[in-house]
């Protein structure tokens, strides 16, 4: 059964690895007209499949695919008045179209290791995320699928599918991102780093 679950369109049909020095592009909501338009002036980094309950997922998919760009590389270039924050209490302020519900970007305004990075979904571009954007690098928050109703017995099969696609999968973020979070927290707390224990 898990082999037939739709993971995400950028995973189910094979992973595109993108183009070096991809310059970015435009992302759009799903409205038929007067679309919200986001312009990105860089490629994404840390593009990954996310199983958390907060990220926007295409209809029928159990994962989102989300990457980050520097906040300075993102601008709303059309129909900004259609955007609203989904949950003002969440660390990531997810801006969604009030009409179609698609999340266009997430921004962190509070002190946080990822402040200065915006979270985006490259499949919202005209090429569906395959025209040059960084490919999916790993899968995070896989166990979170259970809390959203996925039968726990299916999760091992989901993990096997992810591995067959060449994706390591975690129940948090990838080790380099977890190290970045720990480093940020340690610096904030005044920890002095030493070269040996």
Curated annotation (Swiss-Prot):
Enzyme Commission number(s) of this protein: 4.4.1.22
Chain positions recorded as Zn(2+) 2 binding sites: 50, 52, 55
Record InterPro entries: CENP-V/GFA, Formald_GSH, Mss4-like_sf
UniProtKB keywords: Lyase, Metal-binding, Zinc
Gene Ontology MF annotations: S-(hydroxymethyl)glutathione synthase activity; zinc ion binding
Catalytic activity: S-(hydroxymethyl)glutathione = glutathione + formaldehyde
Residues given in the record as Zn(2+) 1 binding sites: 29, 31, 97, 100
Cofactors named for this entry: Zn(2+)
GO biological process: formaldehyde catabolic process
Keyword Nucleotidyltransferase carried by entry: no
KW Metal-binding (keyword) present: yes
Domain CENP-V/GFA, first and last residues per copy: 22-171
Pathway: One-carbon metabolism; formaldehyde degradation; formate from formaldehyde (glutathione route): step 1/3
PANTHER family: CENP-V_GFA DOMAIN-CONTAINING PROTEIN-RELATED, GFA DOMAIN-CONTAINING PROTEIN
Family: Belongs to the Gfa family.
Name of the protein in its database record: Putative glutathione-dependent formaldehyde-activating enzyme
Organismal lineage: Eukaryota, Fungi, Dikarya, Ascomycota, Pezizomycotina
